[in-house]
Amino acid sequence: MAKYTLLKKEGNARRGTFETVHGTVQTPAFMNVATAAAIKGGLSTEDLEHIGCQVMLCNTYHLHVRPGDDLVADMGGLHRFTDWKRPILTDSGGFQVFSLAKLNQIKEEGVTFHSHVNGKKIFMGPEESMQIQSHLASTIAMAFDECVENPATYNYAKQSCARTLRWLERCKAEMERLNALPDTINKNQLLFGINQGCTYDDLRVWHMQEIAKLDCDGYAIGGLAVGEPAEDMYRIISAVEPYMPADKPRYLMGVGTPGNILEGVSRGVDLFDCVMPSRNARHGHLFTKDGIINLNNAKYARDDKPIDPKCDCPVCRRYSRGYIRHLLKAGEMLGMRLAVMHNLYFYNNLMAEIRQALDNGSFAQYKSEYCVKLDTR
């Protein structure tokens, strides 16, 4: 069960819905990153519901290593394990795997690397990634792709694109096999293919054209937001977008700042994820409608205003900047929890405002009014 419905369009920006076995996602949407099946900062799944999270994103590699995907399967899959009723997306593990692997350990069959926990040698290829994600029983599984370092030579990027295409074919075949097994927890698991090609426009376009032929449930643009200038990222999105199936959701992986999201939406992207809101919060950097504030600055010690006077989140309704700064400085867990809750609310509310603007036909105006204020670095 997977159906993307385009409700409205303003320029290339899309307002739609994406139906899954675990509920309907209103797009554009931000997926909240729960690497080890939990948000870093002490938020529960109930908290996520209250702050408007639609999709939780979990990490295949980390859950494979600890507690183990077999254990999660025995517990009924990620939804029962975490008591999260809404959609879950699992990444393929590729990004972590390739950061741990040496170049000469990357073969056609897959990748050999060592666990960051105990040093144990692990092999992962397309079939293994699909098997792990099937055990996790996520709503959406990401295809296993090669995450090439940026910059990469043109020739290597071309070889990598071709290999990632072959791996996607294997991922699709393995998922079809797994979804047909009688003991598979989620027989309606969806598969998203991933576009690669570094910052080479022709490789990106060729690769997108080829993976689109495989009729996946959705498509992602990967390998960006890894140090390249923002202008390169925007150029690649614009180059690839015309070749992305219009009837499938589009996901920009690992992005990004509020400004990046606004630019991505304007170029036709539906889904985003990033560790930035939770990571920044844990270091006292909090998002507001007027930009980021750094609670580490001494000027906030006696500040009795909420983090953002324009925000209606549970944190801003009750607590002051001065109090949250004190908690963070004292190392109190509550400080991290409140900061993370605010930042994730900010991101989820940003997406709700974007959807409302698209509904009203006023997205261009919304973007122009807010993009200058937001951190667009």
What are these regions (language model features)?
Residues 128, 132, 159-170, 206, ...:
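A non-catalytic, amphipathic alpha-helix used as a structural packing/dimerization or gating element
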Residues 138, 169, 173-176, 242-245, ...:
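Generic secondary-structure signature for well-ordered alpha-helical cores
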Residues 162-165, 174, 178-180, 186-307:
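Glycine-rich phosphate/ribose-binding loops and adjacent secondary-structure elements
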